Structure formats: structure tokens, C-alpha cells
Amino acid sequence: MKIGVFSVLFYDKNFEDMLDYVAESGLDMIEVGTGGNPGDKFCKLDELLENEDKRQAFMKSITDRGLQISGFSCHNNPISPDPIEAKEADETLRKTIRLANLLDVPVVNTFSGIAGSDDTAKKPNWPVTPWPTAYSVIYDYQWNEKLIPYWQDLAEFAKEQDVKIAIELHAGFLVHTPYTMLKLREATNEYIGANLDPSHLWWQGIDPIAAIRILGQANAIHHFHAKDTYINQENVNMYGLTDMQPYGNVATRAWTFRTVGYGHSPYVWADIISQLIINGYDYVLSIEHEDPIMSVEEGFQKACQTLKSVNIYDKPADMWWA
């Protein structure tokens, strides 16, 4: 398994300095934002799509440092009820897929998207309860009239380009659980899979180990984000897991994103890595940092330290003992 990092952490650096820092930290891969929520500081889509020399220079800067691109990322909302947002998200995603094809980057990370309640809606609506029944009506509308038609078309485009799409299982979007991931995959094709981030599973009450087994057995894990979550049970008792307090209210929030090893022990992370490999995923652990009580530098380095201590780098030996 390789260890990488989402380069959005280092937008305070220029491209070359960022690459130097990642390489000096002993990592193997970088995940590069191309637009949407991650931004595009290090990767200007139109420039690279239009100019082969710039593409070659871009890749040379990366490979000269012994690094590879694990994936491009353009997390956004391609089925937004805001037509401008939806159009921009779709265009960015398709351009990113085209660039990935040109540069032999195997996967593009994004969100599934979330629609409004109906065709007249101006804002997204995320139904998470079947009753009152209006929510079930909204849910069916979003899946059958918005999500599936969009992704059926996009999945065929991804297949034509031979680029996998890794949808992050994230709250606020229709695909946020193993079930919804497999539901969309069944309605599209095998190019649609998961960008599995355990931090978004823990707070939903989903065991990441079980999710890895479910999705891995379906060959549906395309990318992995390494980020932790701390659950404060006393605060859960007050606010519930659907806590709407700002992320900065760490003392009172029910749960908080943490750097790897500060929500769950290294033993848990060792089990996660083992189960990923056992269930068919042996690609990259891409570090994210959204820890509210650590600097980016400290959080990143501690995540590196924890993951390096429990990672499985080599292929297994022949079972000479069996």
C-alpha cells in the first residue's frame, strides 16, 4: 500500500515547494485538486488540456521527485438545483476525466451530488428519514429523476475515457453509505466506485471495517482518504450525531474530525489497512487534514508517522509454513 496526501493541504506553498515537501516527508503519491471545493491551485484544467508541453512539464515535476498522482479531485454538486453550479460541476468533472485519461491517472474523486426537493427548488434537500412521507417522495424524485440519469451518462463517459470515478461517501449528498454507493453502482457501471473515507462513516455509526468488506467484495473501492473522527459520547447524548454546531465548537460538538490516530488507535488503523488489502484494495492511503486543534504541519506529520508505523508496504511471502 502506498501513502499519499491531498495537496489541498499545502495551498500556502507553490507547486514545486509542495512537491519537495511531500517527497521529503517520505510519501509516494499526491492527490491533486482540479476545481470545485478542492480548488485548482496546482492544476489548471484548461491550460493542461490545451497544451501538451505543459502537461509534460507538470508530470515531470512530479515524477522527478519519485511521486505519482493517486487521483484528481473535483468534489462538487453536478445535480445541484442551482443550474449554474450544476453546469460548472459537470464541466469540471468531464474536463478532469479527460485530463486523467491523457496523463494516465486512473481515478477521479468527487461527490455524487444532491438535488432539490423538486424541479422548482432553489436549494438542496437531503432527506434522511422516510416519514413524514414527503421526504420519501423527495428521495425517490432525487434518485430516479436526477441522480441515476446523470450518473448513467457520466459513467459511460468515464468508461469511454477508461477512468474510474471514486465517489466520496459524504453527508449531505445522496451517496453517503455503502448501500447508496452500491445502489448507484448497480444503476450505472463498474467505473463508479467509492472514495472511502472512514471519518465520514464513524460518525454515521458505520463500522469502516464492515464497509470495507461490503464494498471491497464488490470491487467498489477506487480510492481511500485517511482521516479520523473523534466521537464524544457525552455530547452525542445532548446533540445527537446529526449535530449542526459549527466545526469550531470542538468542546461541545458530538464528533470532530481528527488527524489519523487521534480519533482511533493505531491498532484500528492497522486493521483498516489489513482489511483493505484482504478485500482487494491495495492502492493508496491519501492523507487529509481537517483537525481543528492541530496545525496542518503537525497534523500531517502525525498522520504520516501513524500510517507509516502500521502500513503494509510489501507483497506477502509464499506461505512456506502452510
Model segments located where?
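Conserved, mostly hydrophobic/aromatic
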Residues: V5, V22, I30, I62, ...
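Active-site acidic/histidine proton-transfer and metal-coordination neighborhood
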Residues: D17, S61-D64, P78-G193, A270, ...
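C-terminal helical cap(s) of enzyme catalytic domains, especially alpha/beta-barrels
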Residues: V296-P316
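Acidic (Asp/Glu)-rich catalytic clusters
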Residues: L19-E24, L48-S70, I97-D104, Q152-E160, ...
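Active-site beta-loop-alpha junctions enriched in small/polar residues
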Residues: F6-F10, G33-N37, C74-N77, G113-A115, ...
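Glycine-rich, proline-tolerant flexible connector loops at the mouths of alpha/beta enzymes
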Residues: G33-A57, S112-D119
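Acidic/histidine-rich catalytic cores of soluble enzymes
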Residues: K2, I30, F72, V137-Y262, ...
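Short, acidic/polar
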Residues: D12-V22, K87-I97, Q204-I214, W269-I272
